[in-house]
Amino acid sequence: MRIDALALRNFRNYDALNVTFAPDCNVIVGENAQGKTNLLEAIVYLSSAHSPRTRADRELISFGKNEAKLTAQAFARSRDFLLEVSLAAGKRRKIFINKVPAKKGSDLTDVLGAVYFCPEDLLLIRDGAAARRRFMDDALCQLRARYAQALSDYHRAYEHKTRILRDSEEYPSLLDTLPEFDLRMAQSGAVLIYYRARFCERLGEYARTAHRECSGGREELGVTYQTVSTISDPLAPIETI
């Protein structure tokens, strides 16, 4: 797969950008704070419908603007694709693949895959659990469509629950709907826990082999996934978590 061209409008620091890429390796150079990372962020967003730097799509829209658009011409699976994402403040984003509305953001991953590396990756070790969850979310949303859907469902239920708790003092009857959203969060959360545990298990296998080679066989590296204390076995079937 490859990206042949990219167009941005009102995305981060770009009022308008149109760029074409070589079919092989491309090197992006420039002064600091000129938008190199923003360009890479746009490519990642077009491959996953998620930014590796923020969870709020509003932050991707240029300051003082109300909407943004990302467009890419890509080649994958022996055919051409046109990927389009429109962002608008206070509205749901719109995603089109070859002018056809996408049912979900993970449909982009079926066309374009991207791996994003940055200096902040060191925060996986130095920072708290939130950075590690974000890393797994970004990877698994591209690898497993079911995970991407579960993550979206979880956040949606969480936002509903937050609004209910916020407004319950004025409208106490809203509290009657809390169990429904608790159930939705539990169901989606079970899917997230299962896939994260499997991801860490596979990652540990590769990391163990690589570290053994780097240390000349003198050291062993292990990766384990620890979730909430009420989950005794995160690798158990989803229905039992």
Question: What are the roles of these predicted feature ranges?
Answer:
Residues 227-241:
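Small-residue-rich helix-loop
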Residues 123-217, 227-228:
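An accessory alpha-helical subdomain
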Residues 15-16, 20-21, 44, 53-61, ...:
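Phosphate-binding site recognition
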Residues 88, 224-228:
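Short loop/turn motifs enriched for small/polar and acidic residues
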Residues 1-45:
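Pre-Walker A-like glycine/lysine-rich segment at the N-terminus of P-loop NTPase domains
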